[in-house]
Amino acid sequence: MRFKAAWRLVAYGIVSLCVFLNVSAFAQDPANKPNADLQGVELIRVSFSQLTPDATVCGLSLGVIQPLLKNKLMDGGFIAIPETDTLATLGLMTTYDQGRNACGTSATLGVYKKVSYFDESVGWLRAGYVVLWQRGQQVQSGVANHAASTAVVVQQLANTLIQSWREDNQTTQ
């Protein structure tokens, strides 16, 4: 009886995996690509969300991270200016585990475009931001290495953004 139950579990696992792979493949189909993308984006304002209190304990500083990201994006072809409707925003959510003397950071880099729209529920024009592109990555390390580990993650996210931007603008450049 245990043998049948084990095989049944394996069969369910294989079916679940096939369904997952099918959904993942479908989600990557160019026909399902979102309408919002980076096509035509050239000018950006690079912004940063506030660091958590634990970030200081973990050695993170916006004074180090800000120029790292901004320079990476500019080297990749973006033009950074102080005023534009397109934002590239980096958020770093950091926690410190005192018991293990370790830090964890969840980094999110996104590109957002300010748009105006008519809100029928209130009857007037509003403004807000739409997501053009967004990715995230996590890193865990000891306190002594966390700033360097986080810098690597920020650079990887910037590289991914630059690659996506170039792909979206292949035909327009």
Language-model-detected regions and their locations in the chain:
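Bacterial N-terminal signal peptides that target proteins for export
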Residues: 2-13
